[in-house]
A protein has these predicted regions:
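PAPS-dependent sulfotransferase catalytic domain
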Residues: 8-16, 48-64, 68-161, 169-172, ...
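Short hydrophobic beta-strand segments
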Residues: 17-29, 127-128
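Short coil/turn segments at secondary-structure boundaries
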Residues: 38-42, 75-76
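Catalytic nucleophile-elbow at a beta strand-turn-alpha helix junction centered on a G-D-S/GDSL motif
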Residues: 27-40, 65-69
């Protein structure tokens, strides 16, 4: 990793839930993860050991959410978590750093970034099936908010005043994922799809990192 923030957004850990003999789910923050994990004990679900994720041969279900809606919800959650931790940070300061440096926490980091982290533990030919967040009720009827209060109109207005021109690159990356809803695709093919069909987006988002990494032996 190039910075401590990288280790937050792309941690050396990965959660995949086994919900049946050959049925798996990859839970993403702000995409029903709390509801899924809170249902595990009552439903007898278990986490797949990280060393076994690459052994999964059946498609892994990934629930996706509207990128803009999830960003608002994720920033709201991040702010409330900081407040609960007792950090003496005012909201204006935190929002400034989010607007300036974007992704400081996984709750509002792009869903595509979550897929990249899954790819680190899976195989290139691991299959993922994308489903809309509304279909999570097929697995659990629990709607757990993790004690997070809904976003206020005031906070939503502040976030909507961000410099969206840069942020929209990443939200569009998630929109590419939403276009795959209802489909099953290999992780490697998903990344190749972005590189081939959205080459400008791929270069703007990933080329700076690749350019730095290429100098390493």
């Amino acid at each position: 990793m190039f910075s401590e923030v990288d280790s937050i957004i792309f941690p050396d850990s990965c959660e995949v839930i086994q919900v049946a003999s050959q049925q798996f789910v990859y839970p993403i923050f702000k995409c029903g993860r709390s509801s899924l994990t809170m249902s595990m004990e009552s439903k007898g679900w278990t986490f797949v050991p990280e060393s076994d994720i690459a052994k999964i041969t059946k498609p892994i279900t990934v629930f996706l959410r509207d990128p803009h809606e999830r960003f608002l919800s994720g920033v709201n959650t991040y702010l409330q978590h900081l407040a609960a931790e007792g950090n003496n940070l005012d909201q204006h300061t935190v929002l400034y750093f989010i607007n300036r440096y974007l992704f400081l926490n996984r709750h509002y980091a792009p869903q595509f970034f979550w897929l990249l982290n899954l790819a680190r533990f899976a195989r290139p030919d691991t299959l993922v099936t994308f489903s809309p967040i509304a279909e999570i009720n097929q697995l659990t009827d629990l709607n757990h908010r993790a004690e997070i209060k809904p976003i206020t109109d005031e906070l939503q207005e502040k976030i909507n005043s961000f410099s969206w021109s840069h942020l929209e690159l990443y939200l569009y990356l998630d929109q590419v994922l939403l276009d795959q809803v209802g489909k099953t695709i290999k992780l490697h093919d998903l990344i190749t799809h972005v590189q081939t069909n959205h080459s400008t987006l791929y270069e703007l988002v990933f080329w700076p990192t690749l350019n730095i990494a290429n100098v390493l032996p």
